[in-house]
Amino acid sequence: MIKWLSEESRETAVYDTILATLADGRHGKLNDMYAHTGFSRAKISVYLKNLMELELVEKVLPGTYEICNAFVRFYFCFLFPHQTSERTEGSAFYEKYIREEYNDFQLLTYRRICQEVLQGRFRTVELWNSRQGKIYFLCREDTGRKIVVDYSGTVCYTSKDYDVLQASMKWEYMTADSILIFSENGYEKTLTEGTVQILVHSVDENS
């Protein structure tokens, strides 16, 4: 990975630092990268532009960036920070450095799968970064109907997940014609008793 990146760009160490900062998914904002790396905002912006041209990074929200290549993100999330351990600990490496964090790592990939499904069904699909710190999708149909989409309940969507969504919408005075939920293993049946229509879509559905 480092060899390939060095062939495509100069100052590999700077790129490595920026990619490692982005890899955990918590420092994607420009100000966070500035605080985390110590590089100037102007320098970070230049390197981000180059990484986007290489199709390694993309801007997902105003001022917010993510690694869009899953292999690159895996490398900088799990392997790059522990290169010495990678060579010396063998099979124990996974148990020590990957297993507990892997579900969080998968969530971004899960979101991208959901986004691809939505882009095939709706006229527009945008990300909404709520003030509660959760990210949702905002979609519109050709008729103008607005759909709020929650992909966060990847195991089983619960009433707690729904309450967080409702609080986020209320805080920002947002309304929706329908709410769409992505979930791997269903949802609490009591959720269908509300006044808002809730649709459930598993990522393995073809419809």
What are these regions (language model features)?
Residues 48, 61, 141, 149-153, ...:
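Active-site proximal loops enriched in glycine and acidic residues that flank catalytic Cys/His/Asp
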Residues 145-148, 175-181:
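Hydrophobic beta-strand segments of well-ordered beta-sheets in folded domains
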Residues 177-207:
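Domain-level recognition of nuclease-like catalytic cores that cleave nucleotide substrates
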Residues 26-29, 172-176:
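Short, surface-exposed connector motifs at secondary-structure boundaries
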Residues 83-84, 90-93, 172-175, 203-206:
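Glycine-rich loops and low-complexity Gly/Arg-rich segments
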Residues 109-170, 188-190, 207:
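Catalytic centers of nucleases
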Residues 1-133:
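Accessory nucleic acid-recognition modules appended to NTPase machines
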Residues 79-82, 160-164, 194:
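Surface-exposed beta-strand edges and their flanking turn/coil or helix-capping segments
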